């Protein structure tokens, strides 16, 4: 199963992937109408983020072949960094 960890200003997600193609999305950065999402391709552990929020930033990491503790650490840091 793929794992997706991301954070945006205001809101952060840590989601499990779907099947072999892991993907997820996060919304935040000022309002719920402003979305950012990240996709990952199963097998190579690559992820990217396209934040559409103005004045903000975000990143996404798709972890497929990394240990569980690394995944939980990324997700934990994500929520800590976006705590308001």
From Swiss-Prot:
A Pfam family per the record: KRTAP
Entry annotated with the keyword Signal: no
Gene Ontology CC terms, in alphabetical order: cytosol; intermediate filament
Keyword entries, A-Z: Keratin, Repeat
Functional note: In the hair cortex, hair keratin intermediate filaments are embedded in an interfilamentous matrix, consisting of hair keratin-associated proteins (KRTAP), which are essential for the formation of a rigid and resistant hair shaft through their extensive disulfide bond cross-linking with abundant cysteine residues of hair keratins. The matrix proteins include the high-sulfur and high-glycine-tyrosine keratins.
Protein family membership: Belongs to the KRTAP type 19 family.
Subunit and interaction comment: Interacts with hair keratins.
UniProt-recorded name of the protein: Keratin-associated protein 19-4
Organism: Homo sapiens
Lineage summary: Eukaryota, Metazoa, Chordata, Craniata, Vertebrata
């Amino acid at each position: 199963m793929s794992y997706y960890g991301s954070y945006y200003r205001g809101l952060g997600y840590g989601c499990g992937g779907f099947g072999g193609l892991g993907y997820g999305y996060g919304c935040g950065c000022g309002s719920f109408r402003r979305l950012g999402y990240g996709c990952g391709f199963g097998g190579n552990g690559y992820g990217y983020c396209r934040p559409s929020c103005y004045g903000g930033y975000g990143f996404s990491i798709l972890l497929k072949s990394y240990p569980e503790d690394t995944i939980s650490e990324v997700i934990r840091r994500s929520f800590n960094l976006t705590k308001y």
